[in-house]
Amino acid sequence: QERRQSPE
């Protein structure tokens, strides 16, 4: 499972 940070 890959966790990414959304570019907010």
From Swiss-Prot:
On the 2D-gel the determined pI of this unknown protein is: 8.9, its MW is: 42 kDa. This is Unknown protein from spot P9 of 2D-PAGE of heart tissue.
